[in-house]
């Protein structure tokens, strides 16, 4: 039975979908004004894992992840570059998709862009004004009146007096209260024409928070199962989403029996660098495409999932090397089953049960990966057909996490991308020289080549028929 840690209740809860067998999930996506960094990769990988496990568990999942393609940062970057908003955002949407594909991740079922949902946003703002939860200020902006919603703060667990305006919630002259946040931004004379839309409140553009409320409600309904995102979005973004969505639907007072906007809120932990939160403002961030130049995509996914999704991760090349070494151990064991196949495992299989118990405990991937390493230990001890059976189980369980689906030989030889040192071509040249030395009965030279390769982290494996395989140690 799956349990999910729900940020709203601050506890693990048994997962009960609104419609049996079906799951509707929304994840806050990227603001597309620059290339994606490794923090974005964690969001992508974590919720890719969640969707894969839900589907492996038999659920029909509708996975929506939005694209924010109108935002102050986008506008500023477009002005700085002297290009239209659409040219900038399209370029970085393409780059995001390229990064995601390179990481080996699934595409969301729906990937709405904010600018395609302006009408829905305006409709929701209109309802909030009608419900006396929003007002137009003297500067032309339309703001949400936070103190008029008594239940505001339920996600962050803070009272109104404890809350701060937070990131992206600028306190403007027109606000009645510093906690109020903007729903519709009045157009400024210096802003480009492609950043404004007509509305009942004058030309302008949507605020950041209303975008996700409108898109999620339009695509998933006013009440859905799971909403996810990074921990930094819990407040104010997700808090404001709840306020807007429930305020538009129920007004100031949601009754006890009224369905909440979202049943389960999930938040992944931060990426840290030298024990500091990774962020562009600190200049300590790493682009996905740059990390991919040095590390295999599967290594990056493994690095992310060997830590529980709610815990922070300290990023370093050393940590990625450790992840690479772990994958090498798994693939080396898999290679011992010469014809390992992804098979269907029944729930009665003890390995499958242990793995499922871990994953059903709030997607506990570290514990699930520990099960894989326990199988590796058994593979190393097994003989004959039992090796093959265990290798099949290893591959089948790995598939649930998008691991171990490649040819082991190919993976073990392809880590030149992960390490400095000899290229596969150079290694094959040395192997050919060793074969020639053995044929000439110059065994001292053959042994010297083997030793030299081992010193550079290359392990040779002589096989029947005079063939020689290799892997990185």
Swiss-Prot record:
Its main location: cytoplasm. Its cofactor is Zn(2+). Zn(2+) binds at residues 28, 212, 237, 241. GO terms for biological process: cysteinyl-tRNA aminoacylation. GO terms for cellular component: cytosol. It is an enzyme of class 6 (ligase). Binds 1 zinc ion per subunit. Its EC number is 6.1.1.16. SUPFAM superfamilies: Anticodon-binding domain of a subclass of class I aminoacyl-tRNA synthetases, Nucleotidylyl transferase. Keywords: Aminoacyl-tRNA synthetase, ATP-binding, Cytoplasm, Ligase, Metal-binding, Nucleotide-binding, Protein biosynthesis, Zinc. It is found in: Cytoplasm. It catalyses: tRNA(Cys) + L-cysteine + ATP = L-cysteinyl-tRNA(Cys) + AMP + diphosphate. ATP binds at residue 280. The keyword Ion transport does not apply. InterPro entries: Cys-tRNA-ligase, Cys-tRNA-synt_Ia_DALR, Cys-tRNA/MSH_ligase, Rossmann-like_a/b/a_fold, tRNA-synt_1_cat_dom, tRNAsynth_Ia_anticodon-bd. A motif ('KMSKS' region) lies at residues 277-281. It comes from the Bacteria. Monomer. Belongs to the class-I aminoacyl-tRNA synthetase family. This is Cysteine--tRNA ligase. It comes from Polynucleobacter necessarius subsp. necessarius (strain STIR1). The gene is cysS.
